[in-house]
Amino acid sequence: MTRFIFITGGVVSSLGKGLASAALGALLQARGFKVRLRKLDPYLNVDPGTMSPYQHGEVYVTDDGAETDLDLGHYERFTGVPTRQSDNITTGRIYSNVIAKERRGDYLGATVQVIPHITDAIKEFVQADLTDEDFCLVEVGGTVGDIESLPFLEAIRQLGNELGPDRALFTHVTLLPYIPAAGELKTKPTQHSVKELLSVGIQPQILLCRADRPIPDNERRKIALFCNIKQEAVIAALDVDTIYQVPISYHEQGFDTQVLKFFGMPVGGEPDLSRWQEIVSRVRHPEGEVTIAVVGKYTSLLDAYKSLGEALTHGGIANNVKVKLDWIDAEIFETDGAIHRLEGVHGILVPGGFGERGTEGKIKAAQFARERGIPYFGICFGMQMAVIEATRHLAGLENAGSSEFGHPDPAVVGLMTEWSRGNQLEKRAAGGDLGGTMRLGSYDCHLLPGTKVRDIYGADFIQERHRHRYEVNINFRDKLEAVGLTFSGLSPDGVLPEIVELPTHPWYIGVQFHPELKSKPFEPHPLFTSFIRAAIEQSRLV
């Protein structure tokens, strides 16, 4: 019997509902329970795949090829449970599914309405594809009071009644702002937020109150009184110096204990949080520091690279060093002399991206790393830029480029017009839809014996997650290998280049996939662990 925990948010956005969900999932796991985490997103986009990174942040890709919210990355990193297409839904997808059913006549001529048809579809999603999970944690995106969230709130209200108190718990995340002039935390925003939630028929049983300092007992009593909950269920969600402290902090505040007590389940002994304590200790007490320059396109919004930043941190944890990230807009390197900003860094990483802006700056960064012997890690677009740089400056084809930016001669990177989804071969026509028309999800890759990546992975075959429309043209393999670049990872049929490396360089690797999506604090991705190790060696040379 799966129990459902619904997590909503109020007052303002970005209070940490996703981290709270992930942390609670980790705490329940530490007590021996099996969990699944889900996210309801209230925007009208079918998925975030075509949304601007400045609007949405990172698009997190699952093994089964779903383009989802970045909170699913937190879920995977904290619990280790792989997320799926069935763990993220948007208003756009719900409406699309309902309208498709109406067109097919599934509703037998009924008037299709938000209640019951949209809410029924949401409830069906929440409960679908569950097997033996003890708990399903469902985060509702947005803020209570937003018009977009109303169908989701109504759906979980109905579910709460249908499941009953022995299977449904409502947790609400709010803000307790500190007003310096008054010298105290203010509870009124929380009171009004709960009142707004009550107006749609939901009484929260647990409150997570974001605050930058401990909550005095008198304020807890006040919140409990006005919000109609037990005082011990007013949980302080305190600011911490590392997100890996969050599960420990929530346990100290009694979050997991209150959940079990609500469901009438035995609390038992203390959960084993030793591995979290070890991670926090490594983050707080590193033995050294390395600086990694991240040369990207969306560096003004770091949420666009959320998993990347975490994966680099994981590489630092594995090597017991602090990783200092220098986020650099690639466009600055298109001006004379700016490339010297990279002098003194211990590693250069060019992440994924789309579009022409900043392209030449990324190519210059790859060239700088290659010529100066600085560890270079190119991910997706970053691999393509490394290949273009090598084609221009090693193979002598000065006009080499990507067909993503026009009609270069030669186009060493080209559009994938055909690819396999399941057992069907698909082709994207010019002017067709962009949404979902990429190579998405987990694919096999064969690693060549004797290569650096073969040593790093310690395996002949790997599986990694992809999100791209363009690929390096395999027809340039011989020409590039003749000047020193090795195509060290290929698709099983040998057609698609997945990894390139420069054997004569201390650490120069480009990958077409996104390894950051599979890195976890307790299982750092081997490429990031190796990259940071190479950066440590570089730091001794600078």
From Swiss-Prot:
Domain Glutamine amidotransferase type-1: 291-541
Catalytic activity as recorded in UniProt: UTP + L-glutamine + ATP + H2O = CTP + L-glutamate + ADP + phosphate + 2 H(+); L-glutamine + H2O = L-glutamate + NH4(+); UTP + NH4(+) + ATP = CTP + ADP + phosphate + 2 H(+)
One Pfam entry name: GATase
Keywords from the named record: ATP-binding, Glutamine amidotransferase, Ligase, Magnesium, Metal-binding, Nucleotide-binding, Pyrimidine biosynthesis
Domain of life of the source: Bacteria
Role of this protein: Catalyzes the ATP-dependent amination of UTP to CTP with either L-glutamine or ammonia as the source of nitrogen. Regulates intracellular CTP levels through interactions with the four ribonucleotide triphosphates.
Family affiliation: Belongs to the CTP synthase family.
Protein name: CTP synthase
Organism, scientific name: Rhodospirillum centenum (strain ATCC 51521 / SW)
Gene name for this UniProt entry: pyrG
